[in-house]
């Protein structure tokens, strides 16, 4: 199977309620104990880079701020994924952030191989389904000699830099300084303004919005491409439709 087929199958099979039950999301308690880190700290090397990511999540979850979070990274994940505990801790921190009720604007880097991009999106599906994440992407990004990371919340900012191919020699900087957080927030806002929406997630509370969009869309000329988990109802033959209606005891009037 190609990566797109696998991605669509995962999307079709995903059940948010089942996922919430598996990770005990309903039972998660957002800690209220203040997280003590220096006003700012610099991190070096892969092991400290992983620590910086978790420290940012801790600082965000344990602060009183409920401001939205903006995240962008074109840093490779391969080295960090070698540590089996890091992805678990990172996902737990993300779950706590969503449990706190924070909204996340995730700017994806699509300058990756198609397979890697599909794999990345697959890992984000569970969090997308909460409706608290708005995914974006940057157009016209090209291979760059520099790697960057920028994550900003209402209470902390994490900035990272490295040379392509030498992630292990990069530097990450975490700050809680109000002035610096404001600076990084401006940068994140400007980056978000340059990004385009990757997808819209409609949950039950946005049903009216979805219906409005679908009705408006029917009035626009042009080609459509729909990817569905089963054939749409309008492809059914009249004979099969009649048999189904009769089986369910529905008369012509109904």
Give short role names for the model-derived ranges:
Residues 107-147:
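HKD-type phospholipase D/PLD-like phosphodiesterase module
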Residues 73-89, 109-118, 141-143, 164:
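Short acidic, S/G/P-rich loop/turn micro-motifs used as interaction or catalytic elements
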Residues 2-106, 189-254:
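PLD-like (HKD) phosphodiesterase/transphosphatidyltransferase domain
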Residues 84, 119, 150, 172-174, ...:
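Surface-exposed beta-strand edges and their flanking turn/coil or helix-capping segments
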Residues 137-180:
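HKD (HxKxxxxD) catalytic microenvironment of the phospholipase D
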Residues 121-131, 156-171, 188-202:
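A short, terminal or domain-edge coil/loop segment
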Residues 180-190:
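Compact, glycine/acidic-enriched structural inserts
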Residues 91-95, 126-130, 180:
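Short, surface-exposed linear patches
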């Amino acid at each position: 199977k190609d990566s797109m087929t696998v991605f669509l199958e995962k999307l079709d099979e995903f059940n948010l309620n089942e996922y919430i039950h598996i990770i005990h999301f309903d039972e998660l308690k957002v800690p209220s104990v203040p997280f003590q880190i220096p006003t700012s700290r610099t991190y070096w090397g892969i092991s400290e880079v992983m620590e910086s990511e978790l420290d940012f999540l801790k600082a965000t979850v344990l602060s009183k701020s409920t401001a939205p979070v903006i995240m962008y990274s074109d840093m490779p994940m391969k080295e960090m994924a070698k540590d089996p505990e890091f992805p678990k801790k990172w996902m737990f921190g993300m779950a706590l952030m969503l449990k706190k009720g924070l909204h996340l604007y995730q700017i994806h880097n699509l300058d990756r191989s198609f397979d890697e991009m599909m794999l990345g999106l697959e890992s984000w599906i569970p969090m997308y389904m909460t409706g608290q994440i708005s995914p974006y992407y940057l157009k016209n990004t090209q291979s760059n000699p520099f790697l960057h990371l920028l994550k900003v919340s209402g209470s902390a900012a994490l900035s990272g830099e490295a040379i392509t191919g030498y992630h292990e020699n990069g530097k990450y900087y975490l700050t809680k300084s109000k002035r610096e957080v404001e600076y990084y927030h401006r940068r994140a806002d400007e980056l978000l303004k340059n990004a385009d929406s990757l997808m819209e997630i409609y949950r039950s509370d946005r049903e009216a919005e979805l219906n409005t969009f679908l009705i408006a869309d029917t009035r626009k000329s042009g080609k459509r491409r729909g990817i569905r988990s089963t054939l749409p109802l309008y492809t059914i033959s009249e004979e099969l439709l009649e048999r189904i209606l009769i089986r369910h005891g529905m008369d012509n009037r109904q």
